[in-house]
Amino acid sequence: MNENLFAPFITPTVLGISVLPLIMIFPCLLFSTSNRWVPNRLIALQLWLVRLITKQMMMMHNKQGRMWTLMLITLIIFIASTNLLGLLPYTFTPTTQLSMNMGMAIPLWMGTVLMGFRNKPKASLAHFLPQGTPTPLIPMLIIIETISLFIQPLALAVRLTANITAGHLLIHLIGSATLALSSISLTVSTITFTILFLLTILEFAVALIQAYVFTLLVSLYLHDNT
């Protein structure tokens, strides 16, 4: 029986009902809460990370753009949590689904664009035509800039999906090779297991970096329209 490499990326169901919403809610349980006046070390670390990310992302925004702070911080925590969740055994990574990533990218991108056309219509329209463009090239550049604008949410979603899926496939392939070689050559299987271990550590970094990149690009789109 041939093994399907993409089986881990199929949305899990129970009795024909998708359990994806339950999986997406689970990361919330990973963040501890406390009723004490003085937080413990884990909560203090979480607060420090949130403040650091907030400072890095929102320092370039004006007062209007900083109204999105809570949404962007929630977004990066959610994406990072779901990415890391998929690295646990017998789990599912929601961000490997292009439909879910498009569902996040399109509303956020559309919100920034609509805000720009509402608050700065002239500046938003000026993005379609760079200053100093020769007259014969004006129609072509307007078409190109329009296409590039509408490609932004697709690029956001595809980038996140491709990077997370590629890493999981590599882990799956190297893990299968390690298991197959364990009965043939212990030395070679040890080498492949070491590669698998290092790749898993790298995937933890990729999961966090992709969450940061996704949110940072949304923040840049917001900055261009505020």
Curated annotation (Swiss-Prot):
One Pfam assignment: ATP-synt_A
UniProt cross-references to PROSITE patterns, sorted A to Z: ATPASE_A
Membrane topology of the entry: Multi-pass membrane protein
Catalytic activity from the UniProt record: H(+)(in) = H(+)(out)
Spans through the membrane: 6-26, 68-88, 97-117, 138-158, 164-184, 193-213
GO molecular function: proton channel activity; proton-transporting ATP synthase activity, rotational mechanism
Keyword check for Transmembrane: yes
Keyword Membrane listed: yes
InterPro entries: ATP_synth_F0_asu (IPR000568), ATP_synth_F0_asu_AS (IPR023011), ATP_synth_F0_asu_bact/mt (IPR045083), F0_ATP_A_sf (IPR035908)
Subcellular location: Mitochondrion inner membrane
GO cellular component: mitochondrial inner membrane; proton-transporting ATP synthase complex
CDD domains in alphabetical order: ATP-synt_Fo_a_6
Keyword annotations: ATP synthesis, CF(0), Hydrogen ion transport, Ion transport, Membrane, Mitochondrion, Mitochondrion inner membrane, Transmembrane, Transmembrane helix, Transport
Biological process according to GO: proton motive force-driven ATP synthesis; proton motive force-driven mitochondrial ATP synthesis; proton transmembrane transport
Role of this protein: Subunit a, of the mitochondrial membrane ATP synthase complex (F(1)F(0) ATP synthase or Complex V) that produces ATP from ADP in the presence of a proton gradient across the membrane which is generated by electron transport complexes of the respiratory chain. ATP synthase complex consist of a soluble F(1) head domain - the catalytic core - and a membrane F(1) domain - the membrane proton channel. These two domains are linked by a central stalk rotating inside the F(1) region and a stationary peripheral stalk.
Subunit structure: Component of the ATP synthase complex composed at least of ATP5F1A/subunit alpha, ATP5F1B/subunit beta, ATP5MC1/subunit c (homooctomer), MT-ATP6/subunit a, MT-ATP8/subunit 8, ATP5ME/subunit e, ATP5MF/subunit f, ATP5MG/subunit g, ATP5MK/subunit k, ATP5MJ/subunit j, ATP5F1C/subunit gamma, ATP5F1D/subunit delta, ATP5F1E/subunit epsilon, ATP5PF/subunit F6, ATP5PB/subunit b, ATP5PD/subunit d, ATP5PO/subunit OSCP.
Family (UniProt): Belongs to the ATPase A chain family.
Name of this chain's protein: ATP synthase F(0) complex subunit a
Species whose genome carries this gene: Ornithorhynchus anatinus (Duckbill platypus)
